[in-house]
């Protein structure tokens, strides 16, 4: 558990690149990917190295991509897939916006705490937009405050369980649960 005092002010928790590499072993994606909360580029770099055309944006510039872009206020449709680890305090809003932004048949993959499955407001989100697949990581993957992975590893890793939540715009079936890692 974190108190407000322990949280990073802008909710910047970089994702371990291994999480993106594992995702690419689970799913195929459109040639065009938008990483809309790119932070320091941890995920974007993995997708670029795998040959994808990656649009990297973030509200706060952290040395990678285009800063000053508030994803929740963007108006354009995206003819590609969206993959990100959103700021957790706005995760529900990021999911809704991403699904509404990608064109039909395109994917939205969000790296989220497994506790994202809880809650009445998110239940309504899942009823309106059922994920096609939730990939549960059976080993702990890291999200490090301010990209401080070394400090996190020295401290024993993470007590938080994560997974990849995958939506397809237009999908309205049952959610499949799979394990990886």
Give the positions of each predicted feature.
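Class I S-adenosyl-L-methionine-dependent methyltransferase catalytic core
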Residues: 1-181
């Amino acid at each position: 558990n974190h108190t407000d005092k322990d949280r990073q002010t802008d909710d910047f928790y970089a994702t371990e690149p291994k999480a993106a590499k594992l995702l690419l072993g689970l799913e195929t994606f459109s040639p065009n990917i938008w990483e809309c909360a790119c932070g320091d580029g941890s995920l974007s770099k993995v997708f670029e190295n795998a040959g994808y055309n990656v649009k990297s944006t973030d509200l706060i510039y952290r040395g990678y991509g285009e800063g000053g872009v508030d994803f929740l206020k963007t108006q354009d449709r995206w003819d590609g897939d969206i993959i990100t680890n959103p700021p957790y305090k706005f995760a529900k809003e990021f999911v809704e916006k991403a699904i509404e932004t990608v064109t039909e048949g395109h994917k939205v993959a969000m790296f989220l705490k497994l506790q994202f499955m809880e809650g009445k407001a998110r239940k309504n989100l899942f009823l309106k937009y059922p994920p096609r697949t939730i990939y549960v990581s059976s080993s702990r993957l890291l999200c490090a405050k301010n990209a401080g992975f070394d400090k996190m590893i020295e401290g024993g890793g993470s007590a938080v369980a994560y997974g990849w939540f995958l939506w397809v715009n237009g999908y309205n079936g049952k959610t499949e649960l799979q394990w990886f890692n």
